[in-house]
A protein has these predicted regions:
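Catalytic cores of TIM-barrel enzymes
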Residues: 1-333
């Protein structure tokens, strides 16, 4: 039965935004707010839970610094790596240290909502971190076999981790949601030829893994990724998030023209300008526009899930109100 409106996801607001929302919407916790605004989705990722990876030395997989306080994080440990032997000698994370009890419990306690889960599986970023960004891009040309070997180790960890998690999660989740930011504001970070060689082989394995376990596959990829959306569709991506509206060729009208009916889109409500600076009525008008263009192939959501505190709560409310207006365009069904 066709939906009478697109689904809505608030996203995963920045920690500093929640107090603002609670004050404005008169709520006390995240779930109360999501219930009040009728959010259709819940994202429950293993990496959200402390202790999901219990390495004897206290390390996280592919430990990356998230703030200046994290002084113990390795910085580009493979920056000077030039041989397969060095790759094989590296101390790679072990899936045996993974613990999913907290994630499974949270999934069990989730109500009747669409449940996004699975390891974040950010293999592109992890490989980039291990080499350092500049070295990673250079080594694609100077040492491609080394890049492929490191990619294999990172991806084998995530593939094993997801297999263990999916076997436990079963039907407690609906969509495998994972993220790799392939784009910048203007274009891809790497060219299509390098994308096909270093990204797509393992990317396809992950989408196939998600489908094998009965899940829809939702990819988070910020930036201007228009050039590879056909490849993502061919690889089995069911839904693309977050649709960075101001990035090159990522407006809803262009996406509908080039990919309409072949993939769903989650996001598209601009967080770079519109939600920050526009009036609530202008926000509503743009939500209506995006809904009319993408119709039932849209999940209304911000163009970046981590809503920052510089977005007025009145504009968040306007986005929500327009999302729930029954204005699916019949031309897009």
């Amino acid at each position: 039965m066709p939906a009478d409106r697109p689904a809505f996801w608030l996203g995963n607001p920045h920690a500093d935004s929640w107090p603002i929302y609670h004050h404005y919407f008169h709520t006390e916790n995240e779930e109360e707010l999501r219930l009040k605004i009728k959010d259709d989705m819940r994202w429950i990722c293993p990496q959200f839970f402390p202790g999901f990876y219990r390495d004897p030395l206290g390390r996280a997989p592919f430990s990356r610094p998230r703030s200046p306080k994290q002084k113990d994080a390795l910085l580009a440990p493979l920056a000077d790596c030039e041989s397969i032997d060095e790759v094989e000698a590296f101390d790679w994370p072990d899936p045996a240290y993974l613990h999913f009890d907290d994630t499974i419990a949270a999934l069990r306690n989730t109500g009747n909502f669409y449940r996004l889960s699975g390891m974040w599986t950010s293999f592109y970023h992890d490989v980039m971190f291990l080499f350092g960004m500049e070295n990673y891009l250079i080594k694609m040309y100077t040492d491609p076999d080394v890049v492929e070997a490191v990619t294999r180790h990172v991806c084998e960890f995530y593939f094993a981790a997801n297999r263990l998690f999916f076997e436990r999660a079963g039907d407690l989740m609906d969509g495998f949601f994972f993220g790799n930011d392939f784009g910048t504001q203007q274009d891809l970070i790497i060219g299509p030829e390098q994308f096909d060689r270093f990204i797509m082989p393992w990317f396809r394995k992950f989408t196939e893994q998600g489908h094998h376990h009965g899940y829809q596959v939702i990819l988070h990829s910020c930036g201007a990724v228009h050039k590879v959306i056909d490849r993502l569709i061919d690889a089995g991506v069911d839904c693309l998030h977050p649709i960075q509206a101001k990035a090159h060729n990522m407006d809803a009208a262009i996406l509908a023209r080039d990919f309409g009916g072949r993939i769903a889109f989650m996001g598209g409500i601009d967080t770079q300008d519109l939600l920050i600076n526009a009036t609530p009525e202008a926000v509503k008008e743009d939500v209506r526009r995006v809904k009319k263009i993408l119709g039932p192939h849209l999940i209304v959501s911000p163009s970046h899930e981590a809503l920052l505190p510089n977005i007025p709560p009145q504009n968040v409310e306007a986005m929500i109100e327009a999302a729930f207006e029954n204005e699916i365009s019949e031309n897009n069904q």
